[in-house]
């Protein structure tokens, strides 16, 4: 059984997402900026009802297409010298997915708000400006020649719905046959 894959172009127009922290739960301690955990925590909060898009973004981050930098910055809330983790998004990507994504452009201002992760307090803020458009299968070959590096492959957790492990243990189902 094979799932039908739809092709999409996703653009990130001036998308900026950051997490700032001043200090840890104990005086003099700095909270670690655990980028992937902050990103996942933020995704589940921002995209509560759009789990398929959260899945794609989480996989883009874990595979290095959305990267992050750590720096000292002047935070509007925490003041100068705050430790900041800022996520850098590509300008555009082309992906096949088994999910049906809602097309259009969405802009969302992430007002500064408190995020607590592992007893550390972070201030999350930013701007998400994301466009999603569908691509006809007949156009994929031409676009791939012109915009090759922007084709990043499937970012679904399990695009074909293949059961690779038994729910009861970690043994591979195929190996047990």
Swiss-Prot record:
Compartments where found: Virion membrane; Host endomembrane system
Main location: virion
Keyword Membrane carried by entry: yes
Keyword Membrane: yes
Transmembrane parts of this sequence: none
Recorded topology in the membrane: Peripheral membrane protein
Keywords (A to Z) from UniProt: Apoptosis, Host membrane, Membrane, Viral envelope protein, Viral matrix protein, Virion
GO cellular component, one term: viral envelope
GO molecular function, one term: structural constituent of virion
The organism's place on the tree of life at top rank: Viruses
Subunit structure, interactors included: Homomultimer. Interacts with nucleoprotein and with the cytoplasmic domain of glycoprotein.
Additional information: Most abundant protein in the virion.
Free-text function comment from the UniProt entry: Plays a major role in assembly and budding of virion. Completely covers the ribonucleoprotein coil and keep it in condensed bullet-shaped form. Inhibits viral transcription and stimulates replication.
Name listed for the protein in its UniProt record: Matrix protein
């Amino acid at each position: 059984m094979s799932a039908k894959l739809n092709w999409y172009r996703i653009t990130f127009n001036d998308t900026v997402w950051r997490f700032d922290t001043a200090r840890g739960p104990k005086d003099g301690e700095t909270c670690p900026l655990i980028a992937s955990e902050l990103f996942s925590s933020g995704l589940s909060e921002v995209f509560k009802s759009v789990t398929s898009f959260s899945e794609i973004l989480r996989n883009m981050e874990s595979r290095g297409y959305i990267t992050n930098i750590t720096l000292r910055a002047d935070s509007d809330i925490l003041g100068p010298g705050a430790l900041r983790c800022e996520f850098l998004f590509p300008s555009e990507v082309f992906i096949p997915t088994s999910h049906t994504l809602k097309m259009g452009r969405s802009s969302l201002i992430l007002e500064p708000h408190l995020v607590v992760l592992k007893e550390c307090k972070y201030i999350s803020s930013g701007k998400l400006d994301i466009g999603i458009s569908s691509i006809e299968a007949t156009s994929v070959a031409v676009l791939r020649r012109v915009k090759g590096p922007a084709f990043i492959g499937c970012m679904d957790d399990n695009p074909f719905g293949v059961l690779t492990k038994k729910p009861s243990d970690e043994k591979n189902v195929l190996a047990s046959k």
